[in-house]
UniProtKB/Swiss-Prot annotation:
Gene3D superfamilies: 3.40.190.90, Fructose-1,6-Bisphosphatase, subunit A, domain 1 (3.30.540.10). PANTHER family: FRUCTOSE-1,6-BISPHOSPHATASE 1 CLASS 2-RELATED, FRUCTOSE-1,6-BISPHOSPHATASE CLASS 2. It catalyses: beta-D-fructose 1,6-bisphosphate + H2O = beta-D-fructose 6-phosphate + phosphate; D-sedoheptulose 1,7-bisphosphate + H2O = D-sedoheptulose 7-phosphate + phosphate. This is D-fructose 1,6-bisphosphatase class 2/sedoheptulose 1,7-bisphosphatase. GO terms for molecular function: fructose 1,6-bisphosphate 1-phosphatase activity; metal ion binding; sedoheptulose-bisphosphatase activity. Its EC number is 3.1.3.11, 3.1.3.37. Catalyzes the hydrolysis of fructose 1,6-bisphosphate (Fru 1,6-P2) and sedoheptulose 1,7-bisphosphate (Sed 1,7-P2) to fructose 6-phosphate and sedoheptulose 7-phosphate, respectively. Mn(2+) 1 binds at D33, E57. It comes from Trichormus variabilis (strain ATCC 29413 / PCC 7937). Homotetramer.
Length: 345
């Protein structure tokens, strides 16, 4: 799967990032997201595959495209029987976030990206649109830190695993009222906190790379993005754990349903019978082969954002494979239109 789809998915996230970047700084987050969705879907439908969206832009009734359950790829088109050989057909599950950090794009802030993860059919956890408690850490701390331990305990473990003083550690936390206690505990333990307004996928992945100066991600964010982060961290060999949050009181919002009871019923209907289960990266991205791809929209810790020039754009992307255990950064020049002839007099 890596050999056939690796380059293709890079182009998918590149096209989404370029489309969204044209709306950078214009204050229109919905448009920045919409054009990314359209560009991503258009490029996906040119790939020789039968793909199914398991994490996307929402339920079918709420999203016109890249909705959960939508099929994409050449082999899902009306004339697929003429184009695709069933014996060669690649069936995959896809998790997408065409514009991770819509507010970041709208206001010209760093860290937004177009991201996706793919695996063979059944290889990605179809997370509900709930919140998720998350813990990400570098490979050296894999299996040693634990989401059920306090932040103070985990920082001591991180310090030992990384051979760094606690006051040298940087923990990324989303700037939300629900995290006030967590932020205080991290600071009281002696570590430093980097607050972000949106986009925790990039923060989670940064834990997997040396030199990013990010040593952990802690706190509660969106569950679908947790699966995408887990896919990348599994391939990187980093630590990732997630636990679904189904009680609106925990996050002080009704976005995950009106009541704890209703949410428990919804989880049960999805076949999730242990709502308090802590998932690791291999459970959230369980496929034999997992591929992750991202392209910077605005510049961040890992990647440069889209840079436009007359007649084209330059992008920086990242593709991570669990199969080959590689992470490749790809620098691409996109040339649009016909070159102009310069006449000298």
């Amino acid at each position: 799967m890596e050999n056939t789809l690796g380059l293709e998915i890079i182009e998918v996230v590149e096209q989404a990032a370029i489309a969204s970047a044209k709306w950078m700084g214009k204050g229109e987050k919905n448009t920045a997201d919409q054009v990314a969705v359209e560009a991503m879907r258009e490029r996906m439908n040119k790939i020789y595959m039968r793909g199914r969206i398991v994490i996307g832009e929402g339920e079918r009734d709420d999203a016109p495209m890249l909705y959960i359950g939508e099929e994409v790829g050449i082999c899902t088109q009306p004339n697929a029987d003429q184009l695709c050989n069933p014996d060669e057909l690649v069936e995959i599950d896809i998790a997408v976030d065409p514009c991770e950090g819509t507010n970041l794009v709208a206001y010209g802030q760093p860290g937004s990206m177009a991201v996706l993860a793919i695996s063979e059919k059944g290889g990605l956890f179809a997370a509900p649109d709930f919140y998720m408690k998350k813990l990400a850490a570098p490979p050296a701390a894999k299996g040693k830190v634990d989401i059920n331990k306090s932040a103070t305990e985990n920082l001591k473990i991180l310090s030992e695993c990384l051979d760094r003083a606690i006051d040298e550690l940087v923990v990324v936390v989303m700037k939300r009222d629900r995290h006030q206690g967590l932020i205080k505990e991290i600071r009281d333990a002696g570590a430093r906190v980097q607050l972000i307004s949106d986009g925790d996928v990039g923060a989670a992945i940064s834990c997997g790379f040396a030199g990013t100066n990010i040593h952990a991600l802690m706190g509660i964010g969106a569950a679908p993005e947790g699966v995408i982060s887990a896919a990348a961290m599994r391939a990187l060999g980093g630590h990732f754990q997630g636990q679904l949050i189904y009680d609106p009181e925990v996050v002080k919002t009704g976005l995950i349903g009106e009541s704890k009871e209703a949410n428990l019923e919804r989880l049960s209907s999805m076949g999730i019978n242990d709502p308090d289960k802590v998932y690791d990266a291999h459970e959230l991205a369980s496929g034999e082969t997992v591929l992750f791809a991202a392209c910077g929209i605005t510049s961040g810790n890992l990647m440069q954002g889209v840079r436009f020039f007359h007649g084209g754009a330059r992008t920086q992307s990242l593709v991570i494979s669990s199969q080959s255990q590689t992470a490749r950064f790809v620098d691409t020049i996109h040339m649009a239109g016909q070159p102009k002839t310069v006449q000298l007099h």
